[in-house]
Every structure is written in structure tokens, then in C-alpha cells.
């Protein structure tokens, strides 16, 4: 058996920690549904701020809340605002099954709004039998993927305006450097 990634919430921020709750991680069910993460499913959690790595199970919070609450002992591994990677896994019988699986990956803005919906794609290329790419699920292109979740576009716009840039110049700059 081979353990693989099945779904991932990448860059979601901790909104709260509740030491006295029974345990688990509380997540927005709408976001979990988008990624394919289920209630009571065990997930691995990696804290990008502290490097803590834990495993716990998912419970659902309020739909649309964008919550990410570590409960019980897991609450000791994070601070409000920490950026997490939450990964659900699956077991497959062998590498040939990799061609059939398209793990969904959600990336997040600092306020826990979903930024992008991506999927991982294993394919056979001219160079190797198991090649890899990240694909934008909406556009079905690899070019659209970006890795700038910590950029505050509103603040960037404000800073450029304070330097005397016109709205047209700001729009052109944003369009040239960020694929929204």
C-alpha cells in the first residue's frame, strides 16, 4: 500500500483555539466539501509558523464561517493567525493508481477566503512514467497557479496610490504581476 495526499487546505489561518473542548479541529463544512474532507476524518496538520505537526479528526463548524479552530490538546500547538496545511490522505494499491487520483487543494487568503482551487495531476510524460503538475481547477491550466497568499492586495493598492500612482497604473501593475 502507498499513502498519498487526497485533499489539502493550504495556508488556512487559525481563527481560534479551545483547550477545553474534546479534541479535533473545527472547520467550515463548505470549505471541507470543496476540498473533499469529511467529518470525523483524520487529517495531518502542519503549522507553518511553529513547525508543529499533529494528527487529529475533523468536525464541522458553522457553514460560511471560514473557521479553523484547534481543540483539546491540539490547541497547544498553535496561535490565532498561524498558517496551517491540513492534509487528508488515502491508501492506494500501487503507483499506477496515481493516474486516476486528482487531489483537490484549496489555497487561502489571510482572511480564510478561498483563493484558488487546484488539483494535483500525475501523468506520463516523455521524460518519466510518473510526472507531476499542479493545475488550476477552474481554468485547467498550470500557468494560473500562484504562490503569493500573504500579499495584501488592498494594502498594496493603498501604498501605490500613496506614492501617486493612478488607478489605471495600479490596475495595470496588479494585472501584470498577479493572476487573480
Swiss-Prot record:
GO terms for molecular function: aspartate 1-decarboxylase activity. GO terms for biological process: alanine biosynthetic process; pantothenate biosynthetic process. Keywords: Autocatalytic cleavage, Cytoplasm, Decarboxylase, Lyase, Pantothenate biosynthesis, Pyruvate, Schiff base, Zymogen. It comes from the Bacteria. Pfam families: Asp_decarbox. Its main location: cytoplasm. The active site is at residues 24, 57. It is an enzyme of class 4 (lyase). Pathway: Cofactor biosynthesis; (R)-pantothenate biosynthesis; beta-alanine from L-aspartate: step 1/1. Is synthesized initially as an inactive proenzyme, which is activated by self-cleavage at a specific serine bond to produce a beta-subunit with a hydroxyl group at its C-terminus and an alpha-subunit with a pyruvoyl group at its N-terminus. Its cofactor is pyruvate. Its EC number is 4.1.1.11. InterPro entries: Asp_de-COase-like_dom_sf, Asp_decarbox. Belongs to the PanD family. HAMAP family: PanD. This is Aspartate 1-decarboxylase.
Amino acid at each position: 500500500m502507498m499513502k498519498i495526499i487526497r485533499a489539502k487546505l493550504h495556508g488556512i489561518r487559525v481563527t481560534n483555539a479551545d483547550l477545553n473542548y474534546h479534541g479535533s479541529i473545527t472547520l467550515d463544512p463548505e470549505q471541507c466539501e470543496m476540498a473533499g474532507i469529511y467529518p470525523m476524518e483524520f487529517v495531518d496538520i502542519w503549522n507553518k509558523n511553529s513547525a508543529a505537526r499533529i494528527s487529529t479528526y475533523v468536525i464541522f463548524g458553522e457553514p460560511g464561517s471560514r473557521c479553523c479552530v484547534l481543540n483539546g490538546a491540539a490547541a497547544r500547538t498553535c496561535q490565532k493567525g498561524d498558517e496551517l496545511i491540513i492534509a487528508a490522505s488515502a491508501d492506494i494499491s500501487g503507483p499506477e493508481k496515481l493516474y486516476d487520483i486528482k487531489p483537490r487543494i484549496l489555497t487561502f487568503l489571510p482572511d480564510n477566503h478561498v483563493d484558488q482551487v487546484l488539483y494535483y495531476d500525475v501523468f506520463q510524460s516523455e521524460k518519466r512514467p510518473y510526472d507531476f503538475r499542479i493545475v488550476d481547477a477552474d481554468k485547467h491550466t498550470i500557468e494560473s497557479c500562484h504562490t503569493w497568499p500573504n500579499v495584501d492586495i488592498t494594502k498594496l493598492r493603498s501604498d501605490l496610490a500613496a506614492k501617486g500612482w493612478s488607478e489605471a497604473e495600479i490596475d495595470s501593475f496588479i494585472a501584470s504581476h498577479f493572476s487573480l
